[in-house]
Structures are given as structure tokens and as C-alpha cells.
Regions:
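Compact nucleic-acid interaction/catalytic patches
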Residues: 20-24, 29-62
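Short, charged beta-turn/beta-strand-edge "cap" motif at the junction between a beta-strand
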Residues: 15-19
């Protein structure tokens, strides 16, 4: 089993929100490396090239990845589209998000789950 790392952008068969179908999509691995090494699962959030403004999202560009990869288009990380997936479902890594961009994503997740006042 390949161990994927936090900040990896990987391809997976990702379900539509109504669970009616799935499509191979890029996702960002959120779970930390220790969790990923010891678990059969990873925690991810979805990416899209639909850049329409939306709460709980962060825009990333092709220059926001550390490794030359196949992130071909500016994308929106959907911090409100979270899933736990078996690592066996992951098809391949295509890029790795820079730490400063990952911090923007985790800030949006924090905004999503923080207590409303």
C-alpha cells in the first residue's frame, strides 16, 4: 500500500453529493501523515475548476504546488466537501500543495466548523 501524505492532490472516484454516481476527481488529502500511515483511510476535500465565489473555499493556482504535477488549471478547494476514503481507492498523486496554501484551506475548514455566535 502506498502511503499518501497530507497536502497531496490525488485522483479518486469521488461521489456526487446525492451519491447517485461518481466521477474520477482530484481531491486534497487533509489527514496528517501519522494518521495516513496507520489508517486504511484518508480524509479529503474536493477540488473543482468552477471558480464561482463560494464560502468555505480557497482558490489555488498551478504555481501553488510544490512538485511539478498535473494540476493544469486554477482550481477551487471545497473545504465544505469532506469525505473519508479508503486509501485503496486512490488512483495516483498528481501534485502537492504548498504549506502556505494548505493553511488557507485549513482556515476555511476551521471557519466551517467553528461555533456560531
Amino acid at each position: 500500500m502506498s502511503t499518501y501524505k497530507q497536502r497531496d492532490i490525488v485522483l479518486v472516484p469521488f461521489p456526487f453529493s446525492d451519491l447517485s454516481q461518481q466521477k474520477v476527481r482530484p481531491v486534497l488529502i487533509l489527514s496528517n501523515d501519522d494518521y495516513n500511515r496507520h489508517s486504511a483511510d484518508v480524509v479529503v476535500c474536493g477540488l473543482t475548476t468552477n471558480l464561482a465565489p463560494a464560502p468555505y473555499s480557497a482558490i489555488i493556482d498551478v504555481t501553488d504546488v510544490e512538485q511539478a504535477g498535473t494540476l493544469r488549471h486554477k482550481s477551487k478547494v471545497k473545504a465544505d466537501t469532506l469525505a473519508t476514503l479508503e486509501q485503496a481507492l486512490l488512483i495516483k498523486q498528481v501534485a502537492r500543495l504548498k504549506p502556505e496554501c494548505f493553511n488557507l484551506v485549513t482556515a476555511e475548514i476551521h471557519n466551517l466548523i467553528r461555533e456560531s455566535r
